[in-house]
Amino acid sequence: MSMYPQELGAIPAETMRVARAAYPKGSLAMRLRDELAGIYRDEQFASLFPTRGQPAEAPWRLAIVLVLQYVEGLTDRQAAEAVQGRIDWKYALGLELTDPGIDASVLSEFRARIVAGGAEAQLLDTLLELCKQRGWLKAGGKQRTDSTHVLARVRSLSNLECVGETLRAVLMDLARLDANWLAQQIGPEWLTRYVHRVENYRLPKPESQRRALAEQIGADGLALLRALEQAATPAELQGVQSVQLLRQVWQQYFELREGQAHWRAGPQAEQEGVIRSPYDPQARCGKKRDTVWLGYKVHLTETCQTPPVEPAQGQEQRAAPRLIVQVETTLAEVQDVEVTATIQHELAQADLLPDEQVVDTGYLDAGLLVSSQSDYGIRLLGPVLADTSWQAAAGQGFDLAHFQVDWQKQQVICPQGQRSVSWSVQSQRIEAGFARHTCAACACRPDCTHATSAGRVVHLRPQAASEALQARRAEQQTPEFRQQYATRAGIEATHSQGVRRMGLRRSRYDGLPKTHLQHVLTAVAINLVRIDAWLLGKPPGATYQSPLALLAAHPLLYQPPPPLQEAC
């Protein structure tokens, strides 16, 4: 399909008249058109369409439909029906009341074009740029970042189910492409094993029988791969994506010995991680405390404690709406600390760097405390991990905080005034060792080291990181830090809004790119809901408290909170 850019155009008179009569107070979709008209334009999506072919639906309209779809938590079919029958949607899209709308498949095709063209971020960036022009958003200030888990659209499989379903998926694809060729490679017993979905309740229960079945599946898969490698095999079958996936899965779950596939005790993890489902090979197992899931992870960064907006004549001054400014989607196994620098880089690209970024411990390490400030001018606010040495855990003895470091002389001074005699630099770690005879003669040895054949060894980071880490460990014990860090809790409300209204924690699509597009659309939808509430003068809702919790403020039950203890 081809695309010829068109102007936004005016709302048809009859559509406007009926919509105003049906919605005297307006609706979010109508206010979107009135206040943010022209947010998307056809020219933005021109690169996603060829220059020849049948004319496509106006991309700006499809983008608005996708956003409204997420605002209301609709499926593709429901969104297409809303375009066809909802008066306020026709108003937002500038359509005649008699317009027949679109087919639901058009939305899927448009999403595929966005993903193929790498234009996911454009949907959010365009809205943020408009917010900058309106004075609702600017660089600086304070932002907060947090992540939450996202379940993949596939079921979680055991190892045996995974290999069985992987082979079954390949057979389904080959049967669809060239049934005659496949019929020559398999026997009737293959249909018995793979015609039905491989599920645990259909599998044998004794371990010996399950292992025998795994070996049989391995042999079948290996035989099929060898047949596909023959010169007479049609080239279109050899290049099927599921065939490449079969090779990866067999490398992970089987060991090739003497020309046969032998079942491993557990999957052999490769650099990109263990594949858990053939229907979404990018889905990974993640674990955070007691939560275990198969899928992805989404990181949201939003503004907080926003500055006031210059009011219009006759209006009161109000703080700007809180907006999501950056979205990052990763595999579930990626740790939060690995994406901190990426988030900051993208904020810099969008000219939206904050003065202060509030994060939890997962996004922090000593190096990032330094690089965030030096590279981007950001104060990374959050608690760092505590000292894990036995001295710190016991609450007695000499942990790292008790030692002084003379960086110029490359020596460490212990609490008793003794100096280290060795200084070894290994990558980003420094080891400073004390003489054995010095520690052996020290009366404080039991509080310092358990080593009997050597002196105390102190492990350090490079100077800037080490000093930043020790300063933060001291700072995070103060009441002022706790009060500043309390701001981070507000992003939990953003997660709740995304989960309850827009299904943030359940991927609608397969694969990381499409899941990321879902999260970008969710962020745009949340921003529009917040902008709409801000335009109507509705303040953010207070944190819900149950009737029983409210009794805590009753004069008969009120207890003042205990005072915070000052840091030592």
Question: What kind of region is each of these model predictions?
Answer:
Residues 22-67, 71, 460:
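Basic, short loop/linker segments at the boundary and entry of helix-turn-helix/winged-helix-like folds
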Residues 39-43, 86, 90, 501:
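A short secondary-structure junction motif
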Residues 59-70, 85, 298-299, 342-345:
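Contiguous, well-ordered alpha-helical segments that form the cores/surfaces of helical PPI scaffolds
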Residues 68-74, 85, 89, 133:
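Amphipathic alpha-helical interaction surfaces
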Residues 78, 83, 97-100, 108-568:
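Anion-binding and metal-coordination hotspots
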Residues 89-101:
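Helix-terminus loop motifs that line ligand-binding clefts
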